[in-house]
Amino acid sequence: MLALARQAGYEGGLFLSTLANLTHPASLLAAKELGADRVILPRELSIDEVKQISAACPEGLDLEMFIHGALCVAYSGQCNISHAQTGRSANRGDCSQACRLP
């Protein structure tokens, strides 16, 4: 999608957010090569993982992360409980947080 956006002439910022599951330092280089300007790290990463990933961040690629908010019991974008139970897709920003129900 990033390459298609650039090929279509889009010149704005291209961000890969938490649902891209960029959990390995090498994934940042791939994101940069694909044309990303910013990567938003998954919430599930430990502080040590964030340090390791940020140390490998290529020049010109911005890193961002959330430090507050709901923490999913699954890796971001990998859970289908909400969609299966309620038809609401977490991948479309509409998670019902069904995993938190009693």
Stretch-by-stretch model annotation:
Residues 1-22, 40-102:
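Active-site pocket-lining/capping segments in soluble small-molecule metabolic enzymes
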Residues 24-26:
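Conserved nucleotide-cofactor-binding alpha/beta core module
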